[in-house]
Regions:
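Terminal processing/anchoring signals of secreted or surface-associated proteins
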Residues: 281-284
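Short, solvent-exposed mixed-charge patches
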Residues: 288-289
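Extracellular/cell-surface secretome signature
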Residues: 233-273
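Aromatic (Trp/Tyr/Phe) and Gly/Pro-enriched flexible surface segments
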Residues: 22-117, 126-130, 135-145, 152-232
Length: 289
């Protein structure tokens, strides 16, 4: 039997693999469109099942379906300002920095499946500062927990370090549109809830003046929350001959190599001085994707 050259064997193996599945959002009702009833006042986050307020803070649900007699929680115009939903007709609302000392509001939801250890996930949520806010803050984050964090019988800052957080001293001042907060994390394993809010007390929360005159502090809308398995990206591959190539992790393993991990490159080389030409893998790369 005639032996296939190495590259053709690799192409044949890749061709037999199933196509990668589309990313699945593990956050149920991440766009806040499903509800058990239209909101009629503030503090009704729980109608956007399965979202809850995990502490004594009174987080809100706003939706365009709110009756006209309850305009305070309507969309796009509501008591805190004007902002169309990023998608659909609903979103959540929280106070992450208040005129009341160390008062915090959070939103929490269970994931549809626990995160798998050592797997990269892309975590995203979007925020918009309400027009009437007299303050804006710099850090809003998402904490992925094992089990729920609530119920907590007070409303102070939760004592957790969020895996995803907007940068310190980069203030979330956009009140005319939405700001994406996102990062790729590597799961420890078992995380099955997501909590969004400000995880810092007043002393460690930087503020600037907001666009409005509401004396209550900073109010933010939250929409389109997602946690998805991260799409594989090129990384360093340590091949059996000790050389380094940049390729997808699936290509690397089929070539008998060891992936260097997300973000790794061949400069400086992690495994050898000789770098294979990336272009030689172009056909494989196209087929794998």
């Amino acid at each position: 039997m005639r032996m296939l050259p190495g590259r053709l064997m690799l192409l044949a193996a890749l061709g037999s693999l199933p196509a990668p599945a589309a990313a699945v959002n593990l956050v149920p009702n991440g766009n806040f469109e499903s509800n058990t009833g239209c909101p009629t006042s503030f503090s009704q986050l729980s109608v956007a099942v399965p979202w809850i307020a995990p502490t004594a803070g009174t987080s809100d649900y706003l939706n365009a379906c709110a009756p006209n007699v309850f305009p305070s929680v309507n969309v796009p115009q509501n008591e805190q300002g004007y902002e169309p939903a990023l998608s659909g007709s609903g979103y959540a609302g929280i106070i992450p920095r208040s005129a009341a000392a160390d008062y915090r509001e959070y939103i929490e939801a269970p994931l549809s499946a626990p995160l798998v250890a050592n797997t990269p996930y892309l975590v995203r949520f979007n925020v918009s500062l309400a027009d009437d806010s007299n303050l804006a803050i710099d850090r809003l984050g998402a904490y992925l927990s094992v089990g729920p964090v609530g119920p907590v019988p007070n409303y102070v800052a939760l004592p957790y370090t969020p895996q995803v957080e907007s940068p310190a001293n980069t203030f979330l001042t956009n009140a005319n549109g939405w700001t994406l907060v996102s990062a790729t994390i590597v799961a420890s394993g078992g995380e099955d809830h997501i909590v969004i809010g400000n995880f810092h007390d007043d002393a460690n929360t930087a503020t600037v003046a907001g666009p409005g005159q509401w004396p209550g502090g900073a109010y933010y809308y939250v929409d389109d929350v997602s946690v998805e398995v991260a799409t594989p990206t090129d990384q360093a591959c340590c091949l059996p001959n000790g050389s380094c190539a940049v390729m997808l992790p699936g290509e690397c393993k089929l070539a008998g190599g060891a992936p260097g991990g997300p973000g790794s490159t061949c400069t400086p080389s992690p495994c050898g001085p000789t770098k294979l030409r990336k272009s030689s893998w172009g056909t494989v790369k196209t087929m794998y994707r």
